[in-house]
Amino acid sequence: IIHTQEFANADYTGNPVNRCYYCKHELFTRLEPIAVEGGFAVLAYGENASDIGDHRPGAEAAKLFEVRAPLKEAGLAKGEIRALTASLGLPTADKPQMPCLSSRIPYGQAVTPGKLAMIEQAEGVLRDAGFSEVRVRHHEQPGGALAKLELGQAEMERFVGEEMMANVAAQFREAGFTDVTLDTRGYRRGSLNEGVALAKG
């Protein structure tokens, strides 16, 4: 287990648009001496062909440390990786995507352990209720925190029942959220990056 210290870095906790750079920089800083000590010539990480064109500041840290991305280099996208792992009988074939919880917080709003705990607890509520494609976005607002839910389109109809919504809202309040809303556009990978893409033109 590698213990990283990104929360000690204000550049990370301030949550700028290149937050992932500071996270990966911290990780590779810790891994590099371990690789040298173990006699490993190359460090690798999990970027793949589906990530090409997305907002990926962590890739800049990988370039700085000369960390390889073999899945991307082989041209393998997420669907192909899942198919390959299924053919090999690996248990990760159907594992839901689990990007960093900090990606649920809008840029410019501070990343804190408390917020991440709220997000993790809230997403656990939805998964325990049988939802598979879920994201809970944490938005600061006057007087508390808003949870914006993104669910897969196929699962949204099941959510909007009165009893389900009431139960989820109650458990989200227990997690620390004051308000809960459903994004009717459904789950969108990297939805908080949409403003970054627009800014880039």
Q: Which residue stretches match the model-derived regions?
A:
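Short, electropositive alpha-helical surface patch
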Residues: 55-62, 110-113, 198-201
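Peripheral terminal appendages
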Residues: 39, 117, 122-201
